């Protein structure tokens, strides 16, 4: 019979005298790590003074899950994953193909998310390029500008008591590679874009395999993808975009990177409180569970719908971050006042609202490097304080 025995005294002369604690039959794809998994499961119960039978049940399940996957120690299940499997093992004949189980395994390996994120987004490429052309400046200067934006974040940290774990940045590797390299090793939340700017249908920058591209990224870097999407788009366009997002999500599952999906409805559509909620529901129905969502300013009704949808479809989602869409500081603060009421909203990643005017002045040589850094840092601090004020209210 399948399973194991626990011997607490002398070893009997015959295995027929041993009590077998049965496990579950699975297809064996790999044998490496099975022993480690078995012992980790057993100790999970034994060290909590649970019965030997219960401890052995955990051991059998952990071993079964590891041998059914192409992996070694990283394939060992988390506690939530283990209990889900034990509750549903009779319906899970092939654990490696069970989507719910695999999702629990994926989220169980994530590092702990910051409670809040105060993000400065400067992963813009087209907007910076267009600004450089408008100001008759060599686009090569954008690289320097993005390094200065890193200094703005550092200055804001120095002037406030915010934790570095709550600091976020969105930086591209087209113009921001030096900026990215300069923050290597910092405990900041870092996200990088993969979308070709302004593409609709969605295309990935640089072409080729998105999975191959992610292989060179540090695992701590979050994959950010902006998609201009509306659930009422023409069916051909919608399916093309959805295929791209599914490909990206699969690549993130394979690479182990977290995914932030940014949704912006095209301006041609009339604003509707159900647009974003319907979009989220559509992606969840497609089996796409991003770790993060990045969403525009919304009304109370939309936030409530979004909260219900996320908690219903993926209670392990890290949360929602607000985007700015180049709105005024006052408009952004108004969006904070609404979003901060909802537990699912974890903060913001705002860009042009904080730096665009100063970037233009810098390119036109109306301000120097230090003035630019200070201006953006002060704006950034102002938004962080505004977010804190809103959260204290609720």
Locate each region found by the language model.
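Alpha-helical scaffolding segments of alpha/beta enzyme cores, especially the outer helices
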Residues: 144, 148, 240-254, 278-282, ...
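Active-site-adjacent beta->alpha loops and helix N-cap segments on the catalytic face
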Residues: 231-251, 297-313, 329-332, 362
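Conserved phosphate-binding/catalytic region of the ribokinase-like
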Residues: 1-98
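Distinct, well-ordered alpha-helical segments
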Residues: 180-183, 269-284, 299-311, 332-336
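Alpha/beta catalytic barrel-like cores
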Residues: 92-233, 289, 318, 330-339, ...
């Amino acid at each position: 019979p399948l399973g194991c025995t626990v011997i607490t005294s002398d070893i009997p002369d015959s295995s027929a005298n041993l009590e077998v604690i049965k496990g579950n039959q699975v297809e064996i794809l790999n044998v490496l790590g099975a022993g480690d998994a078995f012992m980790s499961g057993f100790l999970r119960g034994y060290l909590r003074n649970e019965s030997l039978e219960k401890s052995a049940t955990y051991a059998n399940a952990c071993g079964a899950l590891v041998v059914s996957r192409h992996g070694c120690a990283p394939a060992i299940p988390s506690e939530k994953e283990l209990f889900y499997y034990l509750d549903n093992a009779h319906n899970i004949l092939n654990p490696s193909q069970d989507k719910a189980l695999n999702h629990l395994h994926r989220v169980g390996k994530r590092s702990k998310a910051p409670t809040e994120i105060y993000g400065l987004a400067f992963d813009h490429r087209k907007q910076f390029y267009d600004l450089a052309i408008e100001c008759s400046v060599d686009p090569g200067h954008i690289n320097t500008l993005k390094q200065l934006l890193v200094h703005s974040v550092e200055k804001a940290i120095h002037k406030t008591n915010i934790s570095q774990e709550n600091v976020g940045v969105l930086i591209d590797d087209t113009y921001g590679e030096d900026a990215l390299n300069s923050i290597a090793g910092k405990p900041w939340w870092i996200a990088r874009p993969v979308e070709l700017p302004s593409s609709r249908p969605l295309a990935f920058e640089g072409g080729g395999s998105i999975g191959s591209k992610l292989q060179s990224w540090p695992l701590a870097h979050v994959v950010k993808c902006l998609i201009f999407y509306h659930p009422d788009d023409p069916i051909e366009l919608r399916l093309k975009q959805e295929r791209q997002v599914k490909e990206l999500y699969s690549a993130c599952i394979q690479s182990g990177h977290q995914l932030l999906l940014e949704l912006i409805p095209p301006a041609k559509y009339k604003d509707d409180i159900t647009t974003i909620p319907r979009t989220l529901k559509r992606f969840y129905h497609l089996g796409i569970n991003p770790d993060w969502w990045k969403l525009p300013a919304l009304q109370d009704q939309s936030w409530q719908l979004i909260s219900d949808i996320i908690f219903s479809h993926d209670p392990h989602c890290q949360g929602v971050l607000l985007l700015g869409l180049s709105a005024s500081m006052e408009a952004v603060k108004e969006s904070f006042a609404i979003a901060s009421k909802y537990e699912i909203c974890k903060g913001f990643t705002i860009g042009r609202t904080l730096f665009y005017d100063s970037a233009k002045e810098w390119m036109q040589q109306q301000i120097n490097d230090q003035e630019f850094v200070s201006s953006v840092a002060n704006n950034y601090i102002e938004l962080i304080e505004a977010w804190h004020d809103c959260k204290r209210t609720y």
